[in-house]
Amino acid sequence: MRIAVDAMGGDHAPKSTVLGALAAIKENPAITVVLVGDEQAIRNHLPQDIPANIEIVPAAEVILPDDEPVRAVRRKKNSSLVVAVEMAREKKVDAMISAGNTGALMTAGLLYAGRMDGIERPALCAYIPNSKGRVTLTLDVGANMDAKPHQLVQYAVMGSLYAEKVLGFERPTVGLLNVGTEEGKGNELTKAVFPLLQEADLNFVGNVEARDVMQGACDVLVCDGFVGNVLLKAVEGAASTIFSQLKQEFTSSLINKLGAAILKPGLVRFKKKMDYAEYGGAPLLGLKSPVIKAHGSSNERAMKNAIVSATRFVQQDVNEVIQQSLQKNTLGESE
């Protein structure tokens, strides 16, 4: 199996991407990681004797975080991100990963990889940790600011299959993000999609309020990209604030420091559950080729886990399963 990595994408690239690739092949020697980007910058973080299952594909350009996505993808065709997506489209690799510009990755995915038959709009996923020791797969978290009811049903089908095949959730539950749990709650979109989700071949558990997401109210949470992105940023901000305040309190006095020492094992476990690096990358579902988005701040561990996620995606043939399900349920038809 061959996985392409945009070696120049992310806040800590190329060091994090290269070291993550080395960690991934150490854990699974059967895979080959293709590092795409500035060859010399990549080599600076590789051992003198480069492992046989690490390859370098030169790419002279880099799409920066503040680049306008569509313009950057069209003008920087030799960028590490675009080259990696093209490799996936041309079947030179089985999947690609980037921690770079999210908008550019989505644009490149649409322009080069293309949408799956029947999919109108791909959806970007994210993992939100919950109190059950699992994650809630949330989509869409920013690929499309607006969505139609039948498109949310497509998100639900794709997310449910991904949760089952890659995350290992047996018959995952699906929830609709809303302002209340009652069936009649919400705006026109959520009211319209509710009965469609009930009719679909899904383990639909109804509306889910934002406050219940981290309690594990469902395995797959469906929403439009605007609402999903707001939820994701709120969760990230809350987690960051909590850890910052805990650190401040635990270091404010000798007694607090002693208490922190006693609580340290539990705090470490809690932080690990909340750490995005544990979950690696999340997919852009609905594209013909597997495209995985890693967090922009990904470190070595996060990149390694993103490669692991991509490997599972390919092994479980998720795209083919999604395509068959869409054809079976004719969910690609507009309503």
From Swiss-Prot:
Keywords: Cytoplasm, Lipid biosynthesis, Lipid metabolism, Phospholipid biosynthesis, Phospholipid metabolism, Transferase. It is an enzyme of class 2 (transferase). GO terms for molecular function: phosphate:acyl-[acyl carrier protein] acyltransferase activity. Homodimer. Probably interacts with PlsY. Signal peptide: none annotated. Catalyzes the reversible formation of acyl-phosphate (acyl-PO(4)) from acyl-[acyl-carrier-protein] (acyl-ACP). This enzyme utilizes acyl-ACP as fatty acyl donor, but not acyl-CoA. It comes from Brevibacillus brevis (strain 47 / JCM 6285 / NBRC 100599). Belongs to the PlsX family. It catalyses: a fatty acyl-[ACP] + phosphate = an acyl phosphate + holo-[ACP]. This is Phosphate acyltransferase. Coiled coil: none annotated. Its EC number is 2.3.1.274. The lineage of its organism: Bacteria, Bacillati, Bacillota, Bacilli, Bacillales. GO terms for biological process: fatty acid biosynthetic process; phospholipid biosynthetic process. It is found in: Cytoplasm. InterPro entries: FA_synthesis (IPR003664), Phospholipid_synth_PlsX-like (IPR012281). Pfam families: FA_synthesis. One of its GO terms (cellular component) is cytoplasm. Pathway: Lipid metabolism; phospholipid metabolism.
